[in-house]
A protein has these predicted regions:
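ADP-ribose/adenylate-binding Rossmann-like module
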Residues: 88, 99-117
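Conserved anion/nucleotide-ligand pocket segment
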Residues: 136-142, 146-176
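Short, conserved SAM-binding/catalytic segment
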Residues: 49-57
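Conserved Rossmann-fold cofactor-binding substructure of NAD(P)-dependent oxidoreductases
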Residues: 62-92
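N-terminal Rossmann NAD(P)H-binding glycine-rich loop of SDR-like oxidoreductase domains
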Residues: 5-28
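Conserved glycine-rich Rossmann-like NAD(P)H-binding loop of the short-chain dehydrogenase/reductase
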Residues: 29-45
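Rossmann-fold NAD(P)-binding glycine/threonine-rich loop
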Residues: 111-133
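Structural motif
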Residues: 6, 80-81, 106
């Protein structure tokens, strides 16, 4: 099946989804070099997003339910990448990751749920590799503190020992 869309923003009517829509509109317009669409479960809310950002009827709207694998497959077969803001991901993201991995569609989210990420990697990494799907978790604020910690650690390892670490393990602990 031809993947006519470059990106589908799933969860476009939520707060973070609207930020993504605004960015894509400002950077690429609705008929620019990037072919993108908005998706969610409520057509009325998606229409309101189009009106809020003065997006015309040419911008495709995809109605999809996060627990309906058939509708997710239709979406993931039509695009190269799904950027999802629909969380919590452990409740609403598992079937989407499965669909992307199976259909060779890239997946991007901004989760901060490490246990769920581990489950998804364990369940879908082999199929994603075989299909060419790239699964990218935590692409946003939730990952920044850990990324900065790794950067600081590697910088100090290089300074003190003359080399960086090949492997760094982290853990998430309750913050009271």
């Amino acid at each position: 099946m031809s993947k006519d869309l470059d990106i589908v923003v799933f969860g476009a009517s939520g707060y973070t989804g609207k930020l993504v829509v605004e960015y894509l509109k400002n950077e690429y317009g609705e008929n620019g070099s990037l072919k993108w669409a908005i998706a969610g479960r409520d057509e009325t809310k998606l229409t309101a997003v189009k009106e809020e950002f003065s997006l015309g009827n040419d911008l495709e709207t995809v109605i999809v339910e996060s627990d309906d694998l058939d509708s997710l497959d239709l979406m993931t077969n039509a695009t190269k990448c799904v950027l999802t803001t629909v969380g919590p991901y452990q409740l609403y993201g598992s079937k989407l990751v499965e669909s992307c991995a199976r259909n060779g569609t890239d997946y991007v989210d901004l989760t901060g749920e490490p246990g769920w990420m581990y489950e998804m990697i364990s369940a879908h990494s082999k199929e994603a590799k075989e299909s060419g799907s790239r699964i990218v978790f935590s692409c946003g604020f939730d990952s920044i503190p850990f990324d900065l910690g790794v950067y600081f650690l590697q910088k100090n390892m290089q300074k003190k020992y003359g080399k960086t670490s090949n492997k760094i393990r982290g853990r998430v602990k309750a913050m009271n």
